[in-house]
């Protein structure tokens, strides 16, 4: 199994370590590779789009010619996990808590609506306990950093975890989106669930 991690910015190292832990837990002989240009997408079984600044990630991906290819592969069934800014990249509808609708480059493959900077500047980062029983796990303490919120889901998109009634983890077929940072959490539950998607 070969997992690619988009490596322009964001927590590449942290995702790498969580994936390694999940591989070890499941006794999977897996390979993890950084993805920056289209040829890096060749032969991968799944891809992670980490946090960072979603507009920057989109613009760099577009400039390096990977955005369209990524969209095509995800639409064709490549398992993907987008965390925080990565979730924004996957959404079909994006607006900003302050400025409203945005026109940033997106993959736009998931039937969700996301509001960027949902929790406002006062809560730039915080931790919260969420219930992961819908993915067969218990409660987990997770980290939110300038987090967005999934405010609407339609089609086959479904909510897997909420915080105060707002979706923070969603899935649609081969796509997993989190508004928190699972790579900064004590648990490998989210990465394990992603590997379960990859294994099919």
Swiss-Prot record:
Binding locations of L-glutamine: 52-54, 116, 145-146
Keywords: Glutamine amidotransferase, Hydrolase, Lyase, Pyridoxal phosphate
Short name of any one Pfam family annotated for the protein: SNO
Pathway: Cofactor biosynthesis; pyridoxal 5'-phosphate biosynthesis
EC id: 4.3.3.6, 3.5.1.2
GO cellular component, one term: glutaminase complex
GO molecular function: glutaminase activity; pyridoxal 5'-phosphate synthase (glutamine hydrolysing) activity
GO biological process: glutamine catabolic process; pyridoxal phosphate biosynthetic process; pyridoxine metabolic process
Superkingdom of origin organism: Archaea
UniProt-annotated catalytic positions: 84, 181, 183
Catalytic reaction equation(s): aldehydo-D-ribose 5-phosphate + D-glyceraldehyde 3-phosphate + L-glutamine = pyridoxal 5'-phosphate + L-glutamate + phosphate + 3 H2O + H(+); L-glutamine + H2O = L-glutamate + NH4(+)
Subunit organization: In the presence of PdxS, forms a dodecamer of heterodimers. Only shows activity in the heterodimer.
NCBIfam families on file: PLP_synth_Pdx2
Family membership: Belongs to the glutaminase PdxT/SNO family.
Function of the protein: Catalyzes the hydrolysis of glutamine to glutamate and ammonia as part of the biosynthesis of pyridoxal 5'-phosphate. The resulting ammonia molecule is channeled to the active site of PdxS.
Name the record gives this protein: Pyridoxal 5'-phosphate synthase subunit PdxT
Species the sequence originates in: Saccharolobus islandicus (strain Y.G.57.14 / Yellowstone #1)
Gene name in the database record: pdxT
